[in-house]
Amino acid sequence: MKQITKFLILVGVVSFTSLSQAACSFDVEVGDYLKFSTPDMAVEKSCESITVNLKHTGKLPANIMGHNWVLSADADVQALATEGMSAGLVSNYVPPGDARVLAVTSVIGGGESTSVTFS
């Protein structure tokens, strides 16, 4: 099993770490205060793909308090968060074409939802 743990900067950046509970699909909620509802994710090796469904439960628009969900290795979290801020909203706060980004959702505002499926 692999586990994905969420690390928050201004975007949700996650990385692989130790084990918790297992699943192949995850529902994650985040509001206007950057508090993600799912602190960690454990993925069974048998999962052919993983889906993350992100829902913004707040009221502020994406250009004010937008959120996305990003998967990367632990070692890349800080650099991606910093470089992502420079990339801006137009690039979903991730450097375009960056191989360190393993999966990413689009940035969403209050009341919106998005998802990403990856393997």
Model-derived segments and their meaning:
Residues 34-38, 60-64, 78-80:
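Short, solvent-exposed loop/turn elements at domain surfaces
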Residues 8-16:
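Bacterial N-terminal signal peptides
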Residues 16-22:
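Sec/Tat signal peptide C-region and signal peptidase I cleavage site
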Residues 66-99:
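The feature marks short-to-medium sequence segments in extracytoplasmic or secretory-pathway proteins
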Residues 23-49:
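N-terminal edge beta-strand
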Residues 1-8:
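Bacterial N-terminal signal peptides that target proteins for export
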Residues 35, 97-119:
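Extracellular/periplasmic metallocenter environments
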Residues 40-63, 70-71, 114-119:
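Beta-strand cores of secreted/periplasmic/IMS beta-sandwich domains, seen most often
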